[in-house]
Amino acid sequence: MPPLHAVSPAAAAAPPRALSSAARVPQRPGCVPERPNILSSSTNFMSLRAGPMRFYSRPLILQNSDKRAVLRHATIEEIEAEKSVIEDQARERMEKAIETVQNNFNTVRTGRANPAMLDRIEVEYYGTPVNLKSIAQINTPDATSLLIQPYDKSSLKLIEKTIVAANLGVTPSNDGEVIRVTVPPLTSDRRKELAKTVAKLAEEGKVAIRNIRRDAIKAYDKLEKEKKLSEDNVKDLSADLQKVTDEYMKKIEAIQKQKEQELMKI
């Protein structure tokens, strides 16, 4: 607002000067003249009475003002950087979950002998549980048997006892030098039981994948609370993460189907 100027009584009593040509509005035929813009004139003054004067002011009040903080939109580069870190970590963990499922499937025996059948066997060796493969060499001389040769022959009986207790459906025999494990043909009922075991292991893997996805979503939500991502950003990133989750779910289903086919093969 331009400053107010006080003038003398004599000046106030003087007749007002005519508006300059710049302040006049040109006349046009058929048009109503507009009001002259006297507020913009350099000769515009406010006449005040002589004597003490006081000026009052009030604070400016903005109507309908929005006091909420405005979220700065993240750049594409920032969004991609956050996505890369979180999604890469999720993929890495999901890959490990797939490996775990595959290793668990390998322990489920089919109609053929496979050293992986004994991967979960742990022997109480000198008071400490150790994996069988760390204290013995395991070979496959033929399709129906395994040959276990311990590095310490004193552990033969302990290994034999542990294999029997594992209830793998195999028959170990100890000749004092090695342990021969005979893998009998699978019966129809046994195949069905093993198929259920495979389905259970697959579901455990899917649960692990879902938990990994949940952790990644929590990481995105944390960035939203920190004002580093918007709600729309999180929705888009969550949708991309769901595609990754679906991808690994299909991988589990594929290896599960493959294992079930091996079980049903006679």
UniProtKB/Swiss-Prot annotation:
Keyword NADP appears in the UniProt entry: no
Record-stated family: Belongs to the RRF family.
Listed Low complexity bias regions: 1-26
The protein's role, per its UniProt record: Responsible for the release of ribosomes from messenger RNA at the termination of chloroplastic protein biosynthesis.
Residue runs in coiled coils: 75-109, 207-266
Domain of life: Eukaryota
Gene Ontology MF annotations: ribosomal large subunit binding
Name of the protein described by the UniProt record: Ribosome-recycling factor, chloroplastic
Gene3D superfamilies associated with the record: 3.30.1360.40, Ribosome-recycling factor (1.10.132.20)
GO biological process per UniProt: plastid translation
InterPro entries reported in the protein's UniProt record: Ribosome_recyc_fac, Ribosome_recyc_fac_dom, RRF_sf
Region (Disordered): 1-30
